Amino acid sequence: MPRVTRGFKARRRRNRVLKLAKGYRGARSRLFKTATEAVDRALCYAYRDRKQRKRDFRRLWITRINAGAKMNDINYSRFIGGLAKAGIELDRKVLANLAVLDAPAFTKLSVIAKEANA
């Protein structure tokens, strides 16, 4: 049987991995074995952190809303509950932007939330 080196396909596979490892330090960007390990780990982290990013932003928005609500003498849970009772359906991202960038509008919303809770 003739010896098969898998030339083109193997080279293409290795080059694909090394291309993904471009910019890594040291042997991780040059040696196929270490590059494979580094790329596999990086892809796992990327997948995990795409999910984590959504949770992180939600936490950030809630923190900002809570800070804005406390400046208006109402806590976060009563603020959100009051908005729900008043029928105002703004998501946390929009509310956080209002709390940071448009304080008068956020104050009006907190007044509405207080009235709905009363």
From Swiss-Prot:
Membrane-spanning segments: none
One CC-aspect GO term: ribonucleoprotein complex
Family: Belongs to the bacterial ribosomal protein bL20 family.
Record key words, sorted: Ribonucleoprotein, Ribosomal protein, RNA-binding, rRNA-binding
PROSITE patterns, A to Z: RIBOSOMAL_L20 (PS00937)
Lineage: Bacteria, Pseudomonadati, Thermodesulfobacteriota, Desulfobulbia, Desulfobulbales
Function according to Swiss-Prot or TrEMBL: Binds directly to 23S ribosomal RNA and is necessary for the in vitro assembly process of the 50S ribosomal subunit. It is not involved in the protein synthesizing functions of that subunit.
InterPro entries the UniProt entry points to: Ribosomal_bL20, RIBOSOMAL_L20_CS, Ribosomal_protein_bL20_C
NCBIfam families xref list: rplT_bact
One record GO biological process: ribosomal large subunit assembly
Name of the protein this chain belongs to: Large ribosomal subunit protein bL20
Any one GO molecular function term: rRNA binding
Gene name for this UniProt entry: rplT
Domain of life: Bacteria
